[in-house]
Amino acid sequence: TYLSYNKVVGTSLDEKLYLAFEILDYALLSAPGAPLKKALIDAGIGKDVSGSFDSGIYQPVFSIVAKNANVEQKEAFISTIEDTLRKIAEEGIDKKALRAGINYHEFRFREADFGSYPRGLMYGLQLFDSWLYDEEKPFIHMKAIPTFEFLKEQIETGYFEELIREYILDNPHGSIVIIRPEQGMTARMDKELADRLQVYKKGLSAEEIEALVKATKELEAYQEEESAPEDLAKIPVLGREDISREIAPIYNEERQTDGVKLLYHDVETNGIGYVTALFDLSEIEEELLPYAGILQSVLGIIDTEHYGYGELFNEINVHTGGIGTSLELYTDVTKVEEKEFRATFEIKGKALYPKLDVLFAMMREILMESKLGDEKRLKEILSMLKTRLQTSFLSAGHTTAVLRSLSYTSPIARFRDITSGIGFYEVVKDLEENFEERKELLIENLKKIAGRIFRKENLMLSYTSAQEGLAVLEKAVPQFADSLHTGEKESHGQCIIHCKKRNEGFRTSSKVQYVARTGNFIDGGAEYTGALQILKVILSYDYLWQNVRVKGGAYGCMSGFNRIGEGYLV
């Protein structure tokens, strides 16, 4: 069950509100330990709480959502939100949280890193947030630096507290939305549809039935009909001459700094240093790998020796562009038949060059000073993690099915499954539902993994900056590396991943079913070439699209192939 508290906030033509409510979302809800989120969790309303500000419509909506709550908690949900906000409005919002929120969003605005999405496309989409509603104001949200400066000046003035009063507490333009599951709803709706169709069919004459059959045959013929050459010629396409044969340059320079291997990437970054500390996981036993996934989820959102987890998050975002952790896999494409790979636990951060020492200090605080024995917080994180995994399985059922199927035969996929997929979810679910019986084992394993991997001899660094940023990094590395775990290292040799072939299904509340079939074409005697990427396009947009989606009426079908021989259909 989902409980949602929503308020309309002005219009998207107000550039100050456009950013101010992003900052409020951070300070009140999104940051770990944020007061409104904490109040709802402490009240037992939902296993996870999130906020959002939909600013891409003319009347933006600020929302507070509790997941896995109960319908009976509606009044408590409303009163907890409003009582907490009244108290915050009277006593004031944590000023450091506001500064952290402003810096967080300003850093990302200046950095303009949209990952794999073209920067021009993302800027163009943002223009529509205002341009759709006033043709003379396409750029108001692109000129954000003066707005950020304005918001910084308002931190001590009560401006943000007044926004809470005006647009949330005293604003009648809002809604409470409850979404609750109904067991057997899909079966009931299918039966109702079948009954309606049966009644409809009985009311048709023989001529009307014949007309339907004829129309269906005409549709099938249309679906199978080849497009006319003159119609195909109207579609703009790239020629080979339009595609460069030159690959983008790769800047990798292997160095040593204070006895630590450093992979340096000399790229102009506008004064930002991008740091990744990689810790080898190759000697962590298979049965402990799910706990490595949990450790990755815990670090950064649990108390440390010097900070509460909310204070830690704010301290990071006041001084840096953020810190995150992940588990990564690097396959050896020269040994695909042996299926060799390297797994790492990574902590990544970015900061302006003068703040790199603070970045490393915060990374050290997370890795070495986290209170992994905090039972109450661990239980909260497990509940949140379980809920988010459930949500991700529903929203990305195709990738979930492919990963699980590949894990039957691929050690690489098996690693991913037990650290982030269904295998991982099964461990998290068991720990969360049997926490009192399992908590000592959980804490022991988290501490064991941390002690074994966060060591100088287990560390490699990757760093991206212009040349002037390299000296700053080399000055900061020794103190960080020397602060890691020392002493005799417990070793169990190279981890061996065991795969087991299965045929299994998992039931969810989604109406869409996903069926995956996977295998390894290199094991079958074939080899990887770039032609397989062309085959993927042909299959996905021609054969599979026509036969599965257009003619078959299914939701869709996808395929894929990679360098290590893994292939899938889903």
Please give the residue ranges for each predicted region.
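M16 family metallopeptidases and their MPP-like homologs
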Residues: 2-10, 39-152, 172-182, 188, ...
